[in-house]
């Protein structure tokens, strides 16, 4: 009983977005084996976001597996108001994503997979540019890489043993 309540709470806590569903085949002696691969991003729109992949013979099962994987792979995004603290360049494989903070009210200027990650992370004002590979998994991983590089001014000041006013 307690297990069911925990699952209900987790489902309501995170919002999911399916970024891509890919039909993949494995050629075997008897022919082709068809399966589906799903890429899902989950987030609470309050600074926590994660992604996961799942593979199964049916699409709903692949999505369920991807959601489970995404919930185990969450990161925390430091934010300044509704935007990012500074620019970041995330790289994964051939995909590069440039993330830039934007003024309040600018909205999310990003496409496809990048938009899904940023919106579910709760970033409301940001500009992004996709450079290189536009494969959804590379783009999502590069975006998450860029978000993990972000640090608030307070964190940088603490690391350097200075006060925040020294950076101004």
UniProtKB/Swiss-Prot annotation:
Record InterPro entries: Ribosomal_Su5_D2-typ_SF, Ribosomal_uS5, Ribosomal_uS5_bac-type, Ribosomal_uS5_C, Ribosomal_uS5_N, Ribosomal_uS5_N_CS, Ribsml_uS5_D2-typ_fold_subgr
GO cellular component, one term: small ribosomal subunit
Protein origin, superkingdom: Bacteria
Ribonucleoprotein among keywords: yes
GO MF terms, alphabetically ordered: rRNA binding; structural constituent of ribosome
UniProt keyword terms in alphabetical order: Ribonucleoprotein, Ribosomal protein, RNA-binding, rRNA-binding
BP term (GO), one: translation
Gene3D superfamilies attached to this UniProt entry: 3.30.160.20, 3.30.230.10
NCBIfam families listed in its UniProt record: rpsE_bact
Family: Belongs to the universal ribosomal protein uS5 family.
The protein, known as: Small ribosomal subunit protein uS5
Organism: Lactococcus lactis subsp. cremoris (strain MG1363)
């Amino acid at each position: 009983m307690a297990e069911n309540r925990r699952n209900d709470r987790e489902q309501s806590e995170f919002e999911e977005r399916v970024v891509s569903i890919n039909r993949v085949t494995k050629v075997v002696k008897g022919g082709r084996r068809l399966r589906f691969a799903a890429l899902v991003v989950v987030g609470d729109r309050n600074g926590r976001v994660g992604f996961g992949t799942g593979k199964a013979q049916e699409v709903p099962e692949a999505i369920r597996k991807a959601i489970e994987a995404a919930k185990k792979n969450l990161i925390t995004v430091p934010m300044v108001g509704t935007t990012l603290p500074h620019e970041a360049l995330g790289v994964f494989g051939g995909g590069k994503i440039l993330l830039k903070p934007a003024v309040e009210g600018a909205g999310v200027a990003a496409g496809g997979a990048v938009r899904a990650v940023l919106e579910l992370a709760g970033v409301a004002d940001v500009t992004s540019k996709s450079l290189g590979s536009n494969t959804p998994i590379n783009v999502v991983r590069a975006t998450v890489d860029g978000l993990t590089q972000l640090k608030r001014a307070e964190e940088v000041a603490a690391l350097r043993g200075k006060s925040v006013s020294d950076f101004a």
